[in-house]
Each structure stands twice: as structure tokens, then as C-alpha cells.
């Protein structure tokens, strides 16, 4: 390697070997060569009207499409000739894309553990390398004057760039743009860009996020042409008066011009509201005096005052349009830039995070950029769909976890209305200790650029209300330095950072992850107090917003309603961000070509964290998990209180801070089981934060039969919005009405046929008309039930105390070690999956109009009786079999998963009908969104297709169930599934499940909660555990 390359890193004709010998990708002080300074996105319009109307700029040219591509196992394997021409065996690859999804290399999913040996700043010698090239032409007018830039919006993880064989530069940080001036290398006719992308770099140690590790040019590549004298940076702020009636648009402009040229140019600024010009101003270059050395010659400050501006919020995302034009002193336009502007003020005052003077309640979610087919390549349709789904399900905020997003994301959040936490691309979770790099000054340049460049790119977006220094990187001096940098360069927004215990000096907000409502987690040095306790700690006056909570992995989000009760109770608990938005599964195909969802390890990737990437509220195709409805219901902006029966009064409160309910209609109806007794609707007109009492009826309706009476209310939006269709339901609630019933005598038109008991040495047989029951005297089980000689059971009806473990039951045992505290491990250790059943008593009696049978079973493990179940069976003259079950539980057992009955039915009927909670899956600690009603669904719709199979599909608090010929009444939870317990426990992927004969029926008198505060430690609230020593329940079953 020649000394000239070391002393002059910008030497353009250095050989490939000389450049690679520098090993820039293993030098944390070297984050780039020749990369241009960060700035907001530029379009360089040459027409002010086009800038105002946001028309496509003629000076912006996408280079997305098919590029030439060659793959190598290490950068040193790339031949020198590639700099000048494509290799004979080069293929094509789409740009943007991740090369691991195009047939090269392997995607790796890991959460904490680094996918490479930890030896910062060094990375493996075998470092997969992708060599891209594109041949393109440039217009003559671009070559004759001005500057041509190439912009890479996202390349993972580091890359070198050549143009026509000349070395242009180097860059790393996969989530922010890298922009280079290539003007001097371009020629008339064809030009060639060559990009060498390295999978691993020292930057990889700062990108240890919980996600798939993939590589390549995965965001847009663009050519931008600017005039010789051009705009270099623009910063917009919108200070408001104390009463929010007057606003100012402050514009700070920096241009690329010399001191002698400055007098020849000026800046022209316009502010538009739609097609109405609100104001305009012009200003020559030259700043105010800064210090004893003078002024900035290349800067200009402009100001436009606005009276009674329409303020921006997520509820009412009012936007203006600012056009900033660079002109000659005579008024000739050189170029123009334009940005959406939202007038709003973010501040922390008296311990509260305020927007426009109102305390926010963050209804937030963490979102990775993930597409099941395209990996980390995001398209506009997917981004819009995510935003619309968030808005439809009452989210008002999103955290860009854990890196700056595609630039379009912020524009869409501005326009649709979402509060954004913009997060720097820094995570060192796998370091030991975690702050190893964060407290090392050698890594300060890399940290600094990742934070400062994010702020410089994104600061003009009104949707961004909080800056984040990164995620799970411990806490060190680098964080303190960057916190201070942001506070100086953008004092209009608070800074958030969770590391170091969530309440360090580098955060304006106490922002823990997975702190619980009422349980302390006193980890050494970084305790997680219960959230209500945290805000009452001495000298703690900051607001608390959970940066992550409610880990939505698989069948989860149990106990979610408790968080929202606390948020509404304590003003300084200002909400949080659910983890997370979408399951990060990728589409893969089996040997037969069938597509399936793949997770960690499915590509042969090592190391991997298996299905820990499946923790979203949505499936990868954006189909909702049932837990999404729980979030929607808990976060709804309209709250209801049932006040009185006569007259029937309802108190309705709006939690909107800025929005009048001008597109809301309240619908209500009162039902008796499956019958609507009375209903009505009325427009809902509420001012922000207002309460109104509505009289629905003067008196409640009378009823003439037994049943449960419910008042159901919902709020719909009759007109479509930018993010929802007409009649979108945005809020709902219901109450069981305590009405005394005066019922007539019960009567039954069905003919009474007393059952007959027949006893043999092996069986007790009971016959009633066409019905025939058989109890095995040895096993004590209901072995078969015939109707007109057709058998109804494939397996006996028997006790069930376990479930196919949820991710929350398995905990960290599913990753890399066994956790004896996990519920699944406790159940295994207790022997609940290997119980030996013995019938210790069975007795049958013939009564006048019924047969009465008593059975008693004990359940042993390792010789010890753990459970005892006594059942009283009564078969009456109408063919109804009633089962009273009493279960005694040994005190040595952990909480049971369920106490119930299970069997395999022979019938496979298409529809299921029930009266109880529905229509979607619900569990004892996740049923806020479910409603009591009469529901009908196809059998297959009762199953939730979690990618990693587990217990699913329960419906709680059921009063009546009808399935085929079966009719069951009582007070129970039920599940009907084509997949049995054994298969759900042993199968690793949903697509491998095979429908079994018949249908499995679970009837639970009791079911343990599912938890969801997190997925790696037991999180089911004590109220939702089954820790009693005795349980009793009853069901009545008949066949028609």
C-alpha cells in the first residue's frame, strides 16, 4: 500500500487493493470519505409552482431497477477489473433489495447476540461482499453546469463507490442517506456506477437491533442535479405565542456560495395553505453578528408571521407548505425546495409532555421496517397501509424502532397524523457490558454522526415530537454528549433514551421498557419500578412514557387493560409504545414450492433466536392478531359510563385533545341473549375533552323469559376519512343490566322419555330415545355417545389441565437455555403433561326420570396424587346430560393452565354459534375488546393461525354453544379446533399442522391468563392464575 493513499485518502486512481488495504470498515473513526453533509431531502425544483404543488422534480432521477451484481465471500476476492467493467458471470439484481432474499448468502435472525464474533472494531475476514453496477446516461445540460449528486438512502452495512472507475467515497450507517458529488467523473454518453457493499463493518456493532440481519442496497438510489450556487441546508421551526393564537415560521437557510458571491443572491420564502398564499418574504445572505469574528456570509434568516394558524396534531394534521427559493439579486430563480409545515409546540412542563398546551396520552407502537416478501425494503403502499391500520385501531404514535426510517414514512406521518419518536441507528445490546462502546471516546464519532445526521435530515417534520439517542446501548459519556448536542441544535423537542435505567441525565422522559403496573423488578443498578411508583420517586419530576411495553408475541397482550387503567389514573403516566407492530417472518417455500412464514433458523442461520421475531400485533401480511383489537379498545378516544336505569342514561367523554366529534354517531341496542329488544342512534357532538350525558330511554324494556340483558353502545364515523372507510367503528362498550325478571313457569314442549340404565361388567349404558351413552366402568370415562346409532365421539370426554404452551409460557427457554421459572417448565417439572389417571370410584343409579352417575379420578405423578376430579353426571328425560365437576388441587402444584374437559368430536360442521364473549379469540386477562353477544362464525375462523403453534382460539364466559348436533349450556370457556393438543405442542410452524379427524372440543370451567407484560418472565397477574385448591363448574350437553 502506497503512502500516498494513506496521506491522501481522496486520491481517485487508487487501486482496489490499496483502497481495501485501508480497512475503513474496521475503523470506528472512519465513518465516511467524501460523503456530503446531511440535510433535509432535496428536490431542486426549477419552478416555484411545481415546488408548491409537490410535482415530480425534473432534477431528481431514480436509479432503482435492475443492476448488475456479483457476489463474493470477502472483499479481497473481488477482481480489480470489476472497477472498470462487469464480470462475465455477473447476474442482475433488483435495487432496492436485500441480496439474501435474492438467492445470495443467508438472512440471520438474532435478538441480542451478535451474528459475528464480538471483537470490536474487527469483523470476520470472511465478509460477504456484493458488487453492484449500473450503466446510465446523463442529460447534456446536467453536465454543462451545476452539480450532480448520487444519493443512497440505505445500504447495509458499509460501501465503497466508484464512478467510471474513479473512487468517489465510502460510507456506513445503513439507515441514513449517503450522498456524493459525482459531477467531475461524469461524461457524455454512458456512465457507470460501481458499488461494493460489505455485509459486516465496525458499524455492525452499533446495529445490533432485534431484527433480521440482511445486506445490500435496500432503499432508493437517486441522481440529483443542483445549480452551481445552491441551497445546502434548510431548517424550519414554528414558535407559537403563549395563547397559541399567533405563530411564526422561522427559516434558517444555508447556501453553497463564496463570500464574494453572497451579495449576488437572496432567498425568497412563501407560505401556502392549500392554494392560498399566507405570506412571503425575501432576504439577502448574511447572518447577524455571531461573535467578535463576525457573521456567516452563506446564511440567511427569514420570518413569516401567521395569525391564528391551524395547529398540527395527530388528531388534526393541518399542514401548510413552505417554498424556499434561491434567487439572484435580480429575482431570477436558481432552485426551490419545499416542505410541509405544521405549526405545533412540544414541551415538557410541570412533569407533563405537552403538545400545543395539552398533555398527550401516547397510544403508541414500535414498528420495524419489515416486508414478508421484500425484507427491509419498504414501499409506499405498505407504509400507507401500516399508517391506516394504526389510525383505525386508535394508535396516535409510532416509535421508529430502532433506526431512522425511509424518508417517505415521515411525510406520510405528517399528512395522516401520527406522533413519531425518531430514533438513531444505535444499539449495542450484545455488548458485555452493554455500555462498552457508549462510554468509549473512540466510538464517539460514529455515535455522533448517527444522531446528528438523523436530526439534520428529519428536523423539519412536525410529526417528530421526540428524538431518541438509540436503543439498548447502556449509558455512557457518548450519550451525555449527544443529548447536549441535540438540546443546542434543536431545543424545540425533548430527548428520550432508555439506557442506564430509563431515567439518566440523557433523557427528558422516564422511558422504561416492560416496567409493570404494580410490580417492581429490582435489577441491580437498573431497577424497573412499577410505573406508578416510579413517578412518585424523590426528585423525579419527569413524565413517564413506556418506550416498550405489552410484548405482543404470539397469543399475548394479557393484562393490557391494567396499563390503560393506570395511564388514565395518573396524569404523568403518559402512555407507551407496544412491542411491536408486525411479525417479522419472511416468506419461504418448501420442497413442493408452497409458501410459508419462516423465522430464525429456518434458513440455516446461526446463531438465531428462533421465533422471537414473531412478536407483532399483526401477521406479516398485515392481517390482525386478536390482540390488536384489545389495543384498539383500550386506546379508544371515547369513554362511557353507564349511569342510571330509569331513565336509561349514559355519560360519554371525549379524550380528543383538539378534535370536535363532528363525524361520530352513537349506536346503541339492548339485547336479551340473541334477541334485540330496542335500539337507537344519535349524532355525537362533543367538544375536545368534553363530557355529555345522554338519555337513551325513559325506562328499560320488560322481558318475559330468562336470560341476560345487555346494553351495547358503539361509536361509528359515518363519513370516510383519509384513513378509514365510511362507518368505521372507533369505540364501543357494553354493560349487563341488573333487571329483576318476573318469569312465567318454564315449560317444555319436547316429549319426556325417561332414560334407562343398563349395567354390565364393563360398561354402564344409558339409553334415552335415540341417544345412547356408554361409560367405561374401568376407566370411569364417557367413552361413547351415539345418536341414532351414529357415534359422536372419537375420544372419551376427560379432564384437561394443560395447554399447548404459549410463547409467554415458554419464556427464555425457547431461545438458548431452560428457565425453570417459565410456566411451561413448571408444568413439565410438576408432571402435568405426564399424569397417570386412575378411576377410583364409579357408581350409577336409576332414578324415576333420570340416571345419575358419579365418577372419581385421581391424577398421579411420581406416585403422588396431584389432582382429584369428582363428576356427577345426570341424564334426564329430555336427553340432556349435565356434568357437575369438582376438582381438588394439591398445594405443591403451580398454577394450572386450565381446569376443564376435552374430547374429540366426530362431527365436522361448517359453522359455530355461541352466546358469550366474541367474536374474536379472547382469554380471561384479554377480553376488554370482546363483547357478550350471539355470534356465528365458520369453524376454521375460530382458529388463530399463530406462526409458532400454541394454545389459541378460546372464547370466554360462554352461556350457550351450538355446533352441528351439539348444544352446550352453562358458564364456561370453549375452544373448537381441527388441531389437537399434542400436535400444537410439537409442531414448529403453522403450515406443518395437519387437520385431524373430527374436531377437538375444550370446555373450560377455568383458564389461566395468558400474560404479556413481557414474554421472557412469568407475567400473568396473580388475579388471573389458577392457584386455588378447589374448583367447581357445571355444563349441560345435549345432541339434537
From Swiss-Prot:
An MF annotation (GO) of this entry: magnesium ion binding
Name of the protein described by the UniProt record: Beta-galactosidase
Top enzyme class: hydrolase
Keyword Flavoprotein attached: no
Record organism: Pectobacterium atrosepticum (strain SCRI 1043 / ATCC BAA-672)
Keyword Magnesium: yes
GO BP: any one term: lactose catabolic process
Residues noted as binding Mg(2+) 2 in the record, renumbered to the chain: 608
Residues binding Na(+): 210, 612, 615
Annotated site residue numbers, Transition state stabilizer: 368, 402
NCBIfam families on file: PRK09525.1
PANTHER family: BETA-GALACTOSIDASE
Recorded name of the encoding gene: lacZ
SMART domains, alphabetized: Bgal_small_N (SM01038)
Active site residues according to the UniProt entry: 472 (proton donor), 548 (nucleophile)
UniProt KW keywords: Glycosidase, Hydrolase, Magnesium, Metal-binding, Sodium
InterPro entries for this protein: B-gal_small/dom_5, Bact_Beta-galactosidase, Beta-gal/glucu_dom_sf, Gal_mutarotase_sf_dom, Galactose-bd-like_sf, GH-type_carb-bd, Glyco_hydro_2, Glyco_hydro_2_AS
Cofactor notes: Binds 2 magnesium ions per monomer.
